[in-house]
């Protein structure tokens, strides 16, 4: 089917979420994640990027929106379901805050959300494993260090 498309400004995942996304991609599901190229908080953006590499190696496609800061929180699954709301993919949204979202099913709006997502990818940069090799070693260490504090973000 359509796969799973995720749009989130903050990608601060726990082990279970990384495993679920990776396993889906390994099974051949088209999993795509879109985050901003320019973050609004440098330390959160660093943790977001630190999560890319394990996902990319397992087949998840990561994109960064380059024209500016994207703050959308949307999920589209198999072109049949969509979620639009305030839920970030971070610890605070998933475990601490009370977030709000609309679940869309059996409505044309699901395809509208999907089409908007696909249009946004056209002005986004696909991130590859090769991109990780261009990051200086000291930034990689900083990303790893920041992941320790991920549950607080």
Give the residues covered by each predicted segment.
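PLD/PLD-like phosphodiesterase catalytic module centered on the HKD motif
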Residues: 3-5, 10-153
């Amino acid at each position: 089917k359509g796969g799973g498309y995720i749009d989130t400004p903050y990608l601060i995942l726990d082990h279970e979420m990384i495993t679920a996304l990776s396993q889906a991609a390994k099974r051949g599901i088209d999993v795509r994640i879109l985050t901003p190229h320019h973050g609004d908080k440098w330390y959160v953006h660093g943790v977001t990027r630190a999560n890319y590499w394990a996902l990319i190696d397992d087949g998840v496609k990561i994109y960064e929106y380059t024209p500016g800061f994207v703050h959308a929180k949307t999920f589209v699954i198999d072109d049949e379901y969509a979620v639009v709301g305030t839920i970030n993919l971070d610890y605070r949204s998933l475990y601490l805050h009370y977030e709000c979202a609309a679940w869309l099913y059996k409505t044309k709006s699901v395809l509208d959300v999907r089409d908007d997502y696909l249009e946004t990818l056209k002005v986004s940069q696909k991130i590859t494993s090769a991109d990780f090799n261009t990051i200086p070693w000291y930034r990689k260490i900083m990303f790893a260090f920041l992941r320790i504090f991920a549950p607080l973000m």
